[in-house]
C-alpha cells in the first residue's frame, strides 16, 4: 500500500482534530466566547443605566434652570415694580416740596408786601402828624393851644377810666 501525501494530510488533519477535542479547545473557545458575550452584555446594561441616569440628571437640571429663570424673572419684575414705586414716591415728594416752598415764598412775599404797606402808612402818618403839628404851630395862638391841650387831656382821662 502506497501512502501518498494526501493520506498523510488526512491523518494529520484527523490527529489535529483529535488533539483539539482531547484538549477541550471547543469548550474553552465556547467558554471564552460566552464570557466575552456576558462582558459585552454587562457593558451594554451599564451604558443603558448611565444613559438613563444622565437623562434623569438632564431633566432635573432643565427643571432647575426653568425654576431659576422663573425666579429671576420674578426678582426682575419685583425690582422694576419697586423702582417704579420709588420713582413715583420721589416725584410726589418733590412736588410736595416744591408746593411747600412755593407757598412759603408766597407767604414771605405777602408778609413783605404787608410790611411795606405798613411802613408806607406809618411814614404817611408821621408825615401827616408832622405837617399837622407844623400847621397847628403856625396857625394857632397860645390860648387856643392851652384849650386844645386841656381838651385832649380830658379825653385821655375819660378813655383811661
From Swiss-Prot:
InterPro entries: ATP_synth_b/b'su_bac/chlpt, ATP_synthase_B_chain. The chain crosses the membrane at residues 3-23. The keyword Transmembrane helix applies. It is found in: Cell inner membrane. One of its GO terms (cellular component) is proton-transporting ATP synthase complex. CDD domains: ATP-synt_Fo_b. GO terms for molecular function: proton-transporting ATP synthase activity, rotational mechanism; proton-transporting ATPase activity, rotational mechanism. The keyword Cell membrane applies. It is a single-pass membrane protein. This is ATP synthase subunit b 1. Keywords: ATP synthesis, Cell inner membrane, Cell membrane, CF(0), Hydrogen ion transport, Ion transport, Membrane, Transmembrane, Transmembrane helix, Transport. Belongs to the ATPase B chain family. PANTHER family: ATP SYNTHASE SUBUNIT B, ATP SYNTHASE SUBUNIT B', CHLOROPLASTIC. Pfam families: ATP-synt_B. F(1)F(0) ATP synthase produces ATP from ADP in the presence of a proton or sodium gradient. F-type ATPases consist of two structural domains, F(1) containing the extramembraneous catalytic core and F(0) containing the membrane proton channel, linked together by a central stalk and a peripheral stalk. During catalysis, ATP synthesis in the catalytic domain of F(1) is coupled via a rotary mechanism of the central stalk subunits to proton translocation. F-type ATPases have 2 components, F(1) - the catalytic core - and F(0) - the membrane proton channel. F(1) has five subunits: alpha(3), beta(3), gamma(1), delta(1), epsilon(1). F(0) has three main subunits: a(1), b(2) and c(10-14). The alpha and beta chains form an alternating ring which encloses part of the gamma chain. F(1) is attached to F(0) by a central stalk formed by the gamma and epsilon chains, while a peripheral stalk is formed by the delta and b chains.
Amino acid at each position: 500500500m502506497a501512502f501518498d501525501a494526501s493520506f498523510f494530510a488526512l491523518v494529520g488533519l484527523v490527529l489535529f482534530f483529535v488533539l483539539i477535542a482531547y484538549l477541550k479547545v471547543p469548550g474553552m473557545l465556547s467558554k471564552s466566547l460566552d464570557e466575552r458575550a456576558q462582558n459585552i452584555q454587562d457593558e451594554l446594561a451599564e451604558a443603558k443605566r448611565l444613559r438613563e441616569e444622565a437623562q434623569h440628571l438632564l431633566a432635573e437640571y432643565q427643571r432647575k434652570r426653568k425654576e431659576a429663570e422663573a425666579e429671576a424673572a420674578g426678582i426682575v419684575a419685583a425690582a422694576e415694580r419697586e423702582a417704579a414705586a420709588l420713582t413715583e414716591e420721589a416725584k410726589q415728594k418733590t412736588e410736595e416740596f416744591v408746593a411747600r416752598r412755593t407757598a412759603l415764598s408766597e407767604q414771605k412775599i405777602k408778609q413783605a408786601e404787608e410790611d411795606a404797606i405798613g411802613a408806607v402808612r406809618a411814614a404817611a402818618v408821621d408825615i401827616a402828624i408832622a405837617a399837622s403839628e407844623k400847621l397847628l404851630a403856625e396857625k394857632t395862638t397860645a390860648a387856643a393851644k392851652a384849650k386844645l391841650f386841656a381838651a385832649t387831656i380830658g379825653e385821655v382821662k375819660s378813655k383811661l377810666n
